[in-house]
Design a protein with these regions (language model features):
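Enriched for short, Lys/Arg-rich terminal
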Residues: 58-160, 164-167, 194
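A short, surface-exposed loop/turn module that caps and links secondary-structure elements
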Residues: 29-56
């Protein structure tokens, strides 16, 4: 079984207290050594759209969210019980249909409001010019090539220069970065589509977010280093 960690796991781990982090790391090491250990308390998340999401008990209130299949265990997120469950219920792990990369996608229907509200203090003297929509000219194929999930295509195309930053927080990193480049006048490089039977975790974009941990030493370095998002999740094109 492949044992992986996601950048969302290390990011959420860093926001816990020191004692909570120690307990989480101990549980993570135990999961890596033997995820089938009867002492591990797995709970299936019935409300999650992704039926492979489970929670693992760390303490009375701390839960690790894992994505578990027959051949893979991925540490996705950690937080206090209710916040951890809420995170999992709003996301799913999927393979992007165009790029072939594994992505943790925020489920569109769970996001009630994206646009930042604009409050008008007084009536404008003139009719305001239509807001620019920097992505309206892009085809579905273009947006998919940049890693935009299918369910977010409509929101991206309707986004304005003002609302884009709020929208970007809900998109996978490679998609938000490509769109940002477009707003600054650039043309992002479109990655080569993966082979049909390729492992979605091997895609260069996925390698930025998910890493296989082959031994305890690797996992310890990934969880302890304050610069883990730069060293462990470095984009393959940037490696020296």
């Amino acid at each position: 079984m492949d044992f992986r960690i996601a950048d969302t796991f290390t990011g959420s781990l860093a926001r816990l207290t020191g004692d909570e982090q120690k307990a989480v790391k101990t549980t993570a090491f135990d999961l890596q050594m033997n995820p089938a250990n009867p002492g591990m308390s797995f709970h299936k998340l019935d409300k999650a759209k992704d039926k492979n999401f489970w929670s693992v008990r760390v303490s009375a209130d701390i839960r690790i969210i894992v994505h578990k299949t027959a051949g893979s265990l991925l540490l996705c997120y950690v937080n206090h019980h209710d916040k951890a469950y809420d995170w999992a219920e709003r996301r799913k792990l999927e393979t992007h249909p165009k790029t072939g990369a594994a992505q943790l996608v925020e489920i569109r229907e769970t996001v009630q409001q994206i646009l930042v509200p604009q409050y008008v203090l007084e009536e404008p003297k003139k009719v305001a010019a239509p807001k620019k929509r920097p992505f309206a000219h892009l085809s579905d194929d273009d947006l998919l090539s940049y890693g935009v999930p299918i369910e977010w295509l409509k929101d991206v195309r309707e986004a304005t220069e003002e609302s884009y930053l709020a929208l970007a927080d809900h998109l996978p990193a490679e998609a938000s970065e490509a769109l940002l480049e477009i707003t600054t006048g650039g043309t992002p490089r479109k990655p080569e589509p993966a082979e049909p039977k390729a492992n979605p975790f091997d895609h260069p974009d996925a390698q930025r977010r998910f890493r296989v941990m082959t031994n305890v030493e690797e996992l310890e370095r990934a969880l302890d280093a304050p610069w883990e998002k730069w060293t462990v999740f470095l984009h393959p094109d940037q490696k020296q």
